[in-house]
């Protein structure tokens, strides 16, 4: 019945996992390493621990817009926000907006920790952790090892699903917040 079906016909196209050498980062992020993250988070035993990444628009001549994606580790619930660019200020602005909508208490309860990669958009550790209301931290940020996307596997799979709808090279200029 499936005489002409091959691995290339599948969504992952028969790709194999390759092993990479660990590369030392040019600069160490100020936040905590993923190695310091409690084991309960690693085992996905507790809810409300998130992974965060950004999805780029077209590189050549496209708009600077990006998607900021957040994936909850236990339920795999996804949140997606359209940012005007890939700056640290845009990431902090999305977190500020979320905290204002939810309230400081609810934000702290829902977003207990956020694990990010070492991208330039996530280097403002102070901005991402400081609360807009009152004092103290709104969340705790953990940084993955460089070139180790598998440490945020749920988020990377969610980004792969986005790329099925919006392939690489697509310009996000015509996309609005309502479209997300």
Could you describe each region identified by the protein language model?
Residues 72-73:
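Short, acidic, Ser/Thr-enriched surface-loop or helix-capping motifs
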Residues 76-81, 168:
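Short small-residue beta-strand/loop micro-motif enriched in glycine and branched aliphatics
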Residues 105-110, 136-138:
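Short helix-terminating capping/connector loops at secondary-structure junctions
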Residues 63, 80-105:
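Active-site beta-loop-alpha junctions of metal-dependent nucleic acid enzymes
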Residues 6-67:
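Mobile-element integrase/transposase regions
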């Amino acid at each position: 019945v499936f005489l002409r079906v091959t691995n290339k016909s599948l969504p992952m196209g028969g790709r194999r996992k390759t092993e990479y050498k660990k590369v030392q980062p040019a600069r160490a992020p100020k936040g905590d390493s993923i190695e310091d993250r409690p084991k309960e988070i690693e085992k996905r035993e507790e809810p409300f621990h998130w992974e965060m990444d950004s999805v780029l628009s077209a590189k050549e001549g496209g708009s600077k817009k990006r998607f900021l994606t957040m994936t909850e580790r236990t339920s795999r619930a996804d949140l997606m926000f359209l940012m005007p660019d890939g700056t640290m200020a845009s990431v902090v602005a999305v977190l500020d907006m979320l905290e204002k909508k939810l309230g400081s208490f609810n934000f702290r309860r829902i977003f207990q920790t956020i694990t990010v990669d070492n991208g330039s958009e996530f280097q403002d550790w102070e901005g991402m952790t400081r609360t807009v209301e009152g004092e103290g931290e709104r969340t705790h940020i953990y940084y993955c090892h460089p070139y180790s996307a598998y440490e945020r596997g749920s988020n990377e799979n969610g980004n792969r699903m986005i790329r099925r709808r919006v392939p690489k090279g697509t310009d996000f200029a015509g996309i609005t917040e309502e479209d997300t």
